[in-house]
């Protein structure tokens, strides 16, 4: 008789209940292998539209399609068994109307099995968040530096450097909470504003380039692992995998050229005839 142990996946409601408790741990993930490794240590994994820049080589997140997000979301769901999986709704998939957003968000949930979607924006997107939440789709918000608005911001610029700009970001946060979001990513804002948002909201704030006082933190996994040459100010490198990868590939290439690979132990031989 075999015993099958079912791993209980974290839900959006559980993330919401973590407000003010032990910090919430999160990373981005784009494929099954990295999701499987990160899963035991993360409360949620974000299939971010940053996949367009990190994996596909785009300069911004704007070219990312709904089909791309679903494909990567399916891969992450195969690798992650415990963490809540949240999938970004890409640029152009939700801004037109709440009905458009519901059509695309419901497709994401149905085709991937993920537990929530994430939308960028504040006051202007609150009606859409409300529409989705009332129809059973958990939504994570995203305010501050919103990469899909890179052209409006004139680049990836820190938000809230002048206190005169705080009022709009605070209004965005309040509107998202009132609309029913279970958590909100606070990206690229000055530390005092991130603390203020965390104190004023009853839902968890997930910081990226914000404050250690947020209710949780998220980083792009590849940034944290040490891929790429440009390191944003808010990223701490916990590895140097790009150098290790280059070193391993060079060693492989050298061994192939010198015929040191494959060795006798790494090739198949005929079976010895008996008798």
Curated annotation (Swiss-Prot):
The active site is at 187 (proton acceptor). Its EC number is 2.1.2.11. It holds the Pfam family Pantoate_transf. Pathway: Cofactor biosynthesis; (R)-pantothenate biosynthesis; (R)-pantoate from 3-methyl-2-oxobutanoate: step 1/2. Keywords: Cytoplasm, Magnesium, Metal-binding, Pantothenate biosynthesis, Transferase. Mg(2+) binds at residues 49, 88, 120. The keyword Magnesium applies. GO terms for molecular function: 3-methyl-2-oxobutanoate hydroxymethyltransferase activity; magnesium ion binding. It catalyses: 3-methyl-2-oxobutanoate + (6R)-5,10-methylene-5,6,7,8-tetrahydrofolate + H2O = 2-dehydropantoate + (6S)-5,6,7,8-tetrahydrofolate. Binds 1 Mg(2+) ion per subunit. Its main location: cytoplasm. 3-methyl-2-oxobutanoate binds at residues 49-50, 88, 118. Belongs to the PanB family. Homodecamer; pentamer of dimers. This is 3-methyl-2-oxobutanoate hydroxymethyltransferase. It comes from Bartonella quintana (strain Toulouse).
